[in-house]
Amino acid sequence: MSNAMYNKMWHQTQEALGALLDKEPQKMIEPQRNQVFIFQTLATFYVKYVQIFRNLENVYDQFVHPQKRILIRKVLDGVMGRILELKNEMVELELTEFHYFDDILQDLKLAPQQLDIPIPKYFLKEKLEVIKGREKILAQILADSGIDTSDMKYPVKSIPFDEAVKLIQIAERARQGRLRALFMKQIYLQEYRAKQSKMLGKKVTDTWAAALRIQKVWRRFHQRKETEKLREEEMIFLGMNPPPLFNEVSATVIQAEKVDRLRNEVQIKHEEDYREALVTIKNDLKLIEGVDIKENLQDQIRHWFIECRNLTGTFPDYPDVEEGGSAIIFSDKTIQQVIEDIIANQEEEEKNKKKKKKKEKQPKKAKKQKKGTKEKNKEEDEKWKMSPSLFLPAMKEGCNAYKEIWMKKDESWNFSQDYDPELIKEEKRKELQSEIRIQVDELMRQELKNLKLAVDRERERPVKAGKKKDKKGKKGKKKEKKAKKDKDLTADRTIESLYKELVEEGLLIQALKVNLSDYIGEYSYLGTTLRQVSIEPMPSLLDVRQLITLYGIWPLGSAAVHEKAPLVKSLLLAGPSGVGKKMLVHAICTETGANLFNLSSSNIAGKYPGKNGLQMMLHAVFKVARQLQPSVVWIEDTEKTFYKKVPNAEKMNEPKRLKKHLPQILKLLKPDDRILIVGTTRRPFDAELQSFCKVYQKIILVPRPDYASRYVLWKQIIERNGGVLTSALNVSCLAKVTDGFTQGHIVEVVKGVLTDQRIRRQIHKPLTAVEFITAITSMNPVYKEEEESFKNWYAKTPLGKKRALAITGGSTEKAKDKGKRK
């Protein structure tokens, strides 16, 4: 798209955001009791903000104007934070992590795909060089230490020599047997043909009948092919089948990607020009306007001295540097306005003195209204009220800046969308004024002292420094105490050396290149409908994917969002094996460029022994994680860290080493630290629930795929592995039959069936569902009993308990009321 098209999209999005910001205070200020109405309001705002975010993210990625991008980035971070705040409000209201918006999407006439939350591309673009440099260092350390990750991708099992000889012998005998069978088949066919020729003898064939038979066979074959072709064309026309070149990359897509690359190059060039212009324009302004600004400021301050002297009879006290100096007096005000403020302040002081005298004379009122106010407060507490937002002011400020500067700005001269020098001049003029003001304040303070000595004959009163010194001394002692508590165990070591040590010990590992979009799934289309009938639906895979984006990727990717948004320090992914928990952890690191630290009990076994060693390990890990943030600390099979009873086979590994330290680590993590602790578990019921839930702030239950997700999975995984989907392959049948099997099972089966030989034979022998079904029968699915055990465990978690009480609470309260009436 062109610059004009992206500008139009931006203007439309800003208008939609402005309208939404005007509506939000009206809806949220009034307290409400109706939970359904509250959720509908929150969900509607959530869906609309997601639409705005999708458009803004696209615009920010493709805009080449550097000054517009700064404003859009500010608004974009604000929208992201607001979405997270609304999500947090919905979780607190409905007491569940999963929400369904199918009815709202229907009302707003939106497709489910429009609710998909994208990951901003600037997360990786802005630190691409840093990530590449870090990857090179990591690869170099791994190569020097003899740990090659490329060999680890395809592990090879060692086989004894005798077994290897037997395998070769079996394969050779099988090959010879196949050749022998083929030779015997050819002999049999020769003998059969000879017998047939003897039986028929020298019978003269009827050429007319032979021609008719050939025609009949040919016409049948030709008509069958023609019918198949017509049926395929009809299915393509109806949209039931994809067109023949559907999976191939079209020329339009290639051209669009090329344009994107060119826009990125222009973006970088304009950004460099803008940074250079910031320096040059400021220097030019300093030379041209610096002297005039200084003289004007001095004249204003002198005029203020004289006016204050005329009004009050004495010269004013000059504001301190800490207060802001003369900037407080003349902040967006003329000299006349400053004089009016002085008069108004004097009048207010006189009024306040009179009021104080009246209050002293009046008797104190009795405290009769306390009970009534308490009852009112209780009623207000029962009503739901939206908590104040930390991101709305930033969004409103961005919208106001857009209206003031860009809404009606004529940019016909700026076809290339380069920086606007006039805007830079306005900005730098303010900076220059504040810098010169500091120098002027020093001069004018001295001038004011001289005036006071000359006119009023006042001298400076000496400041008593004794108390201040004592206070400073006390503060110093407090700092010393804090320093003792936060003692740096590795003060004599560099971050590079600690980084190298952690890599060599296997605690800092290389994340696999997996995008979150590779986590395939489908939407839950009947979530709201099922909840209306009091049936709790199982979340779909795309619901899980959205939670990973909101709780993991967005806060780690954006520092502005992480500082103000509801803080998520730890995340637990619980689910049966094969549902993609490990893949999601690696996807978080890939999408944000985060470091991956592996603190699994199996990985830290035998490393850094003893209490001091463990303390040193955790200190080194989190010191590097803070310095090179964002960082993800992964604890695989985290239930082992919180075992109820450690199995005898695992006692030597000390799996519970981190149990006491994890809560302490979480307390030390601040909003500035973009560090996320992620735990994965396939047996959460083996852990102590109380300590488990204390450590993990957000618990996400990753389910096995439903029918819709399995249907999409089979199609995409078969195509990715070189398979061709034809009418002979009934994907719907595959999806139904494989109920209970996970993504891991499906991937394993597809890779096993689609060998190089089978892919080559697809032209003559298309794929069928039977091939995949026979391969998957040897695997164990996730049975209903296992799924129920996960549901029962989740119901015992704090959020699960609250949800259960909220569902059953209404009926119990009614029963209590009836009992009281009787």
Swiss-Prot record:
Q: Name one Pfam family in it.
A: AAA
Region annotation (Disordered) maps to 349-384, 459-487
Q: Which PROSITE patterns match?
A: IQ
Q: Where in the cell is it found?
A: Cytoplasm, Cytoskeleton, Flagellum axoneme
IQ domain: residues covered? 207-236
Which function does this protein serve?
Component of the nexin-dynein regulatory complex (N-DRC), a key regulator of ciliary/flagellar motility which maintains the alignment and integrity of the distal axoneme and regulates microtubule sliding in motile axonemes.
Q: What is this protein called?
A: Dynein regulatory complex protein 11
Name the species this protein comes from.
Homo sapiens
Its lineage opens with: Eukaryota, Metazoa, Chordata, Craniata, Vertebrata
